[in-house]
């Protein structure tokens, strides 16, 4: 008789399409551990099916405009922080994209974002990233700097899209049709993918800044105005990556 360890290993190494055969194989095994394992994987299968339904509901705009050709999702991260750049990302996903768990990056754990970042970069038709520095933000204001980063992201795509799906904004000075979608990062897989890549890109930058400017806690606060960050700002003064126009109340 197979041990529980062996059976767990079989389930763990099985592909999704093999689960039903394993369920049938072990359905008459009366050991409670085996039956609990079967229930566990039944729940896993149901969760995957539920996620496919949810993901499909986020392809409404992609299906509506797919006749136009390449669709590009655009989103930004970092409009609100006191320090660091604003980062924008443009992502063109393939029409048959089957990536699961895409969502507004704020609704995902850091671990899940990192996993999806790799999958998106591997499967996307093209990805472009743009950013505006703290100095540029101070020079032209955060809204204009965000638009500039978005235009930069689009310009860095290796393929020209026929339509832009934007999270809530219409980007000026860009010669492509645009569809602004309120809360688009939760309604469009393309925008969600852009949200995730932008978030991971910026978070990694802030973690690197933390290594040379550890007193501000950038690895944890990512430049946002946490109580500890504001306290450090008052104690040490602004760093080279602080946005001067954002910190006038604190220094």
Protein language model features and the residues they cover:
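RNase H-like, Mg2+-dependent phosphodiesterase core
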Residues: 1-72, 79-251
């Amino acid at each position: 008789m197979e041990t529980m360890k062996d059976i767990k290993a079989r389930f763990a190494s099985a592909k999704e399409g093999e689960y039903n055969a394993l369920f049938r194989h072990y359905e008459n095994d009366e050991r409670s551990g085996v039956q609990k394992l079967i229930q566990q994987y039944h729940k896993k299968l149901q969760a995957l099916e539920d996620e496919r339904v949810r993901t499909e509901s986020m392809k409404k705009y992609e299906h509506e405009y797919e006749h136009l050709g390449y669709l590009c999702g655009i989103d930004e991260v970092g409009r609100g922080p006191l320090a660091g750049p604003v980062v924008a990302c443009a992502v063109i996903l393939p029409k048959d994209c089957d990536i699961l768990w895409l969502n507004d990056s704020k609704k995902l754990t850091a671990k899940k974002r990192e996993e999806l970042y790799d999958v998106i970069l591997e499967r996307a038709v093209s990805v472009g990233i743009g950013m505006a520095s703290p100095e540029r933000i101070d020079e032209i204001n955060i809204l204009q700097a965000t638009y500039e980063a978005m235009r930069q992201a689009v310009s860095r795509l290796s393929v020209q899209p026929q339509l832009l799906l934007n999270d809530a904004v219409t980007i000026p000075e860009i010669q492509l049709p645009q569809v602004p979608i309120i809360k688009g990062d939760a309604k469009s897989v393309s925008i969600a993918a852009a949200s995730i890549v932008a978030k991971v890109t910026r978070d990694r930058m802030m973690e690197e800044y933390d290594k040379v400017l550890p007193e501000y806690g950038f690895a944890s606060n990512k430049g946002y105005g946490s109580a500890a960050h504001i306290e450090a700002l008052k104690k040490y003064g602004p760093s080279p990556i602080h946005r001067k126009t954002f910190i006038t109340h604190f220094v």
